[in-house]
């Protein structure tokens, strides 16, 4: 029997281990959504309005959100009326298809435009969402793809954020541009852009402050960052990435709306999916915002930031083996 090529075997093992980590990470969300659905949809009873109402309630409890839930129930009701779905158990698979369909149009990989040098990624988000950690993981990922990377410590109000970035930088041999605690964030990022240009760096990832206690001041600061960046490169930032903590539920959508007013958001990274029962918020985000989901994080490991795959995510959530 012919052996599988080693590279393919290793790649499928990698995919498998990530899928298993994601399944483990989503265990609380699975309990909230998939296991609740199983209890409703077992048995051979026919689909009726009462059953569809129970499915609707379960979706709302699982943080799927009103818009996404209404869309799913409308589609399932139409399929039932046409006779495509008859028995309760058939809803289980149909529901997974609906969930994948919600996510698919809202997913787009991050593509680094090599004509922009450096390609500038401005990372925003409130304190505590895992912004600085995400930057470190993303830098490592891009480095692994053969890109030269530089980091800008633009969160100058949190000394720990600068230290954390410097540790990531040292660990992965990535240069970090930083100034003293409390210095001007826009100035740090401008200096980093100049330095990256001089050193012919491919990608510059800039951290920013996330203090929501003084929302007006934070938004003014971010506006200034964008304005000053554009003095160095009128097309910057080339990616405005917001980092969201899955555990914040509906609040995550409010954060997208807030930051999008001052930074042109082009990508979302959703973190901490392993620590919450609110993984359903991913569908809510996809249905209610126009910003594509780039990455998800389901753990602390440097490899636990991955490009988002709707099929894989839904399969892990429902513990099926469809992980393409």
Regions flagged by a language model, labelled:
Residues 100-324:
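P-loop/Walker A NTP-binding module and the surrounding RecA-like catalytic core of P-loop NTPases
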Residues 1-108, 116-119, 144, 321-324:
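Non-catalytic terminal/linker segments enriched in charged/polar, low-complexity residues
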